[in-house]
C-alpha cells in the first residue's frame, strides 16, 4: 500500500484555508514544538466527533505539520477520493485481512518525513479498549509516539 505523493488540488488548498480560518475564528491557538526528525505517530484520542477533523487540520496547519491520518476506505470513494488523499488520508479497509501495520512500517522506512495520526479507538464511539496497531507500527518503524491534547476550555 504505497501512498501517493500528490500536489494538493486547488479545492483541498481552499478547504484547508477555510478550516484554518474557522479554527482561528473559534479562538484556537496552537502551542508546542514539533519533534525532529518529523517521523512519528501522533495519538489522537479521544476521537468523539466529526469536528475533530476540523480542529485537527487547524492545529496541524498552525504548527506547520503536514501529517497523514488513517481512515476507513469508504471515505475514499468517488467523488471524495482525491480530496481525502490531498488532505493526508491513508485508506484502511477494515473488512480485509491486510497487514496495515507492516504497510505503515514500510511507509516510514521509505520516507525521511512522515507523521501519521491514529485514533486508537478505531471509531468515533466510546470504546473500552484501544486497538494496538499504533504501538506495533511505532515499535516496528523505531519511531516515537507523540501525544498532544486540545484543551476545549482554554482553546
What spans do the regions from the language model cover?
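Soluble catalytic domains of membrane acyltransferases
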Residues: 3-8, 25-155
Amino acid at each position: 500500500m504505497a501512498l501517493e505523493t500528490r500536489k494538493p488540488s486547488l479545492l483541498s488548498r481552499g478547504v484547508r484555508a477555510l478550516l484554518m480560518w474557522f479554527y482561528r475564528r473559534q479562538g484556537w491557538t496552537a502551542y508546542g514544538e514539533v519533534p525532529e526528525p518529523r517521523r512519528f505517530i501522533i495519538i489522537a484520542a479521544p476521537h468523539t466527533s466529526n469536528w475533530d477533523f476540523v480542529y485537527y487540520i487547524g492545529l496541524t496547519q498552525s504548527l506547520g505539520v503536514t501529517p497523514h491520518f488513517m481512515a476507513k476506505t469508504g471515505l475514499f470513494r468517488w467523488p471524495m477520493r482525491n480530496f481525502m488523499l490531498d488532505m493526508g488520508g491513508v485508506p484502511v479497509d477494515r473488512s480485509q485481512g491486510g497487514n496495515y501495520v507492516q504497510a505503515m512500517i514500510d511507509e516510514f522506512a521509505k520516507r525521511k518525513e512522515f507523521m501519521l495520526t491514529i485514533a486508537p479507538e478505531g471509531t468515533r464511539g466510546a470504546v473500552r479498549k484501544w486497538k494496538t496497531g499504533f504501538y506495533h507500527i511505532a515499535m516496528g518503524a523505531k519511531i516515537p509516539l507523540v501525544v498532544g491534547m486540545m484543551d476545549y476550555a482554554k482553546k
